Amino acid sequence: MHFVRHGERGTKMSEDRRDGNIPVLFVSGDTLPEGWEKSVLAVWEKGGSYPTEYDKEGEAPSLDATMTLVIEKPFEEPRLHRAFPGAIEDLEKYRLEVVDGVHDHWIRPEEGKWTYTYHKRLFDYQVQEDLAGGGEGPFAGVAQMDYLVEKLSQVPYSRRAQAITWMPTLDPKTDDPPCLQRVWCRLAEGTDGELYLNMNTHWRSRDAYKAAFMNMYALTDLQRIMAQRIAERIGREVRLGRYVDVTDSYHIYGSYLEEVEERFLRSIRDRSFEQRTWRSDNAIIQDGIQRGRDQIEQEKKEQG
């Protein structure tokens, strides 16, 4: 398998810029690691070259594209890719941050700390205007995911079951606004007569290499949890349908192109798919998951 080296892409990248059209890419995979791997490769090979607001002097521009990624079987094994840049315990802590809100208490914009978590925006959306104004805004929080469960329990085929994160009164003023913008779900009946929960997520911007895998790992787990909640509500099994991930700016930063080449691409060249992925029931993965949970429990004890 041959990959274009980043140093060989100069002519093509400049042509992409002159074209004036940001590349639009579509990839699909049966499993999460397969889809993520294909998406990073697609941006590497076909992404355009664009500057960002975070570039330092002398750094290469980012590779970037608008990406639609389809995961046909979100919970089929293997669930993990060995080349995602992070520790298993960090992946588990991030999952808990998204689905359980274990870091919602870190939202303290008045102290210069976090302005949001995805869990807080999805499960308790509170309108705010002032970064220095403290935690609560003028209106009661909106439990958007509860609405999503209730709506689909009543009308499985509804097109209104969605939750948003963007807060136009606050986010444009911040240095780190949410990347995730919207979650949309709908139930569909398969030819087997079973109900399947389909989920779409929409992102304004995403680091394809360093963030996307962890994002999708957590969001597909949220999909699983929503399916379970709907099933309990309607008294009928709800299985997982496909997961679709749409990103306006799906990018690989120029500052670490060599890391992608040396770590990610090399693993694809040198290892089989089985060798570069893990099943979630692997003992190494389970140990890492437990370490992540233990670290969260320790955080809670230290907070009192």
Report the location of each language-model feature.
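Terminal, non-catalytic protein-protein interaction segments that mediate quaternary/complex assembly
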Residues: 2-304
